[in-house]
Amino acid sequence: MPTFSLVAYPRGCGAGSQEIMTEKKTVITRFAPSPTGYLHIGGARTALFNWLFARHHGGQFLLRIEDTDRERSTTPAIDAIFEGLQWLGLSWDAEPVFQASRAARHVEAVQELLDRGKAYHCYASQQELEEMREKARAEGRPIHYDGRWRDRDPAEAPAGVRPVVRFRSPNDGETIVRDHVMGDVRFPNEQLDDLILLRSDGTPTYNLSVVVDDHDMSITHIIRGDDHLTNAARQSQIYEALGWEVPEFAHVPLIHGPDGAKLSKRHGALGAEAYRDLGYLPEAMRNYLVRLGWSHGDDELFSTEQAIEWFNLESIGRSPARFDFAKLENLNGHYIREADDERLADETIALMTRNEGWKTDDEFRKKLIALMPGLKERAKTLVEIGKGAAFLLVHRPLTCDDKALQLLNPEARALLARLVSRLEARNDWILSEIETTVRAFAEEENLKLGKVAQPLRAAVTGSTVSPPIFDVLATLGRDEALGRIKDQAA
C-alpha cells in the first residue's frame, strides 16, 4: 500500500485539492486527539474503531495531533498518545500531522470563504456580545449571535477594532447529518448561528481547522464520539461552502461507567497507560474495547484478525456502553492463560521493574518462566503474576504475611522439622522426587496433603498463595528451599 504524506499535497483550495478528491479510492480514517497527558480510554476505543474500519477495507489509518492549545500540548503529553497507541498495537500509516503547524493553510481556507461570500468580518465588541447573551437569557431563548454584521457595510467598521471572521450559515432550511450509527440527524439551520472561523488574533477555530485538515488528508470516514454530532452539522456546512465532498460520518455513543454516568476519574483508571501498568495485555484491551458498543452476534472472544474481518459501522449500537471492570479482568485472565510463557515473563519483569523497582537477572527470568504455567492459571493481571513470583526475589529469613504466620503455629513448625530431614535425604532435587517425598511423608503422618503443603508453602514463600508447591520447591533449588524450611522449622 502506498504511504501517505500530507506535505506532498498541494496547499491550495483550488484544482490541486480537487484532484486529490477525485483520485481518492481508498478508505482513509483518522484519529485526531488533543494532547491531555494520556490516551483516554474513550479515545483509545475511537482509535481502535477507526483502525479496524481502515484495516477491514484495506485502507489507511492516519493520526493527527490537534495541538493548537500550546500550553497543554507538551512533548510528554504528545508522547503519551503515541505510546498508548503503540501499546495497543494500533499502527498508523503515515507520519502524524500536527494541526498547529497548518495554521497558514487554515487561514487560506478562511480567505477562500470570504472570497466566495460564505464568511464575513464581524466587529461586535465584547460588550455587545454580552448584551446579546443577557437579552437571550431574559427572553428564554438559546444564546446565539444575532448576525448584526452579516450584511452590514464593512465601511461602517469601527476604527482600531480587529474583527473576527464568521461563517455565513444558512438562515433557513435544515442541515442533515447522514450518520452510519445515528441515522439521519436533522439540525434546523436557525439553531446553527454564524460560528467564528478566525479569532481577532488571527488564529483559526476548531471546526474550521478540522474541516481543512480532514479534506487535505483525504479522509473518507470520520468515526468519533457522539458529542461531536453538532460539530458534524457545522462542519458539513463548511465543506459545502468550500465546494468539497463531505466525508461519511459515524458518531459513537460515549462510554459510561458501571453506574450509567459518563466515564470519569471517579470510576477508576482512564488512560491506556494506566491499564498497562495495572497488568492488562493489549490484546485483551483490544478485545474488550471493540465490544464496548459494537457486537458480532453473541461472540465475546475473538482475535484481532477476526475483529478486522467482522468490523462494520452498522453493528455499532446507539446506546452508551457501560465499562465493566470485572468483565475486563476476566477477559484479561483468558488472554494471560493463552499467552506464551516467555512473553509473560518478560512483560511481568518489565511491569514490576517499572512499578515496584524489581532488580532481576537471567537466572530469575529462567525461574519465572519455569513457574509461569502455575502462576498464570489463576492470575487475571500481570501484577498478580508479579506478586505470585515475588518470593523468588526475597532473601532469607523471609518476612511472612499475617495469614502465613497463622499457619506456622508450633505444631506446624515441628511438622516442618520432621519433613526437612526427609527432604535432605533426597539425592535428586527434581519435581517428581520432591512430590513423591512430600506425599509419602503426609501418609506417614496420617495427614491430608494440604495439611503439609500449607505450612510448607508459608515457609518457602512467606504467603498462603503461590504456584503449585512442588514447582516452587523445584524452582528455588535444593539449598534455598531447604534453607527456607529450616528457618521456619521448630
Curated annotation (Swiss-Prot):
A motif ('HIGH' region) lies at residues 33-43. It catalyses: tRNA(Glu) + L-glutamate + ATP = L-glutamyl-tRNA(Glu) + AMP + diphosphate. Its main location: cytoplasm. A motif ('KMSKS' region) lies at residues 262-266. SUPFAM superfamilies: An anticodon-binding domain of class I aminoacyl-tRNA synthetases (SSF48163), Nucleotidylyl transferase (SSF52374). The keyword Glycoprotein does not apply. The keyword Cytoplasm applies. CDD domains: GluRS_core. Keywords: Aminoacyl-tRNA synthetase, ATP-binding, Cytoplasm, Ligase, Nucleotide-binding, Protein biosynthesis. It is found in: Cytoplasm. GO terms for molecular function: ATP binding; glutamate-tRNA ligase activity; tRNA binding; zinc ion binding. Signal peptide: none annotated. Its EC number is 6.1.1.17. GO terms for biological process: glutamyl-tRNA aminoacylation. GO terms for cellular component: cytosol. ATP binds at K265. It comes from the Bacteria. Monomer. Catalyzes the attachment of glutamate to tRNA(Glu) in a two-step reaction: glutamate is first activated by ATP to form Glu-AMP and then transferred to the acceptor end of tRNA(Glu). Belongs to the class-I aminoacyl-tRNA synthetase family. Glutamate--tRNA ligase type 1 subfamily. PANTHER family: GLUTAMATE--TRNA LIGASE (PTHR43311), GLUTAMATE--TRNA LIGASE, MITOCHONDRIAL-RELATED (PTHR43311:SF2). This is Glutamate--tRNA ligase 2. It comes from Parvibaculum lavamentivorans (strain DS-1 / DSM 13023 / NCIMB 13966).
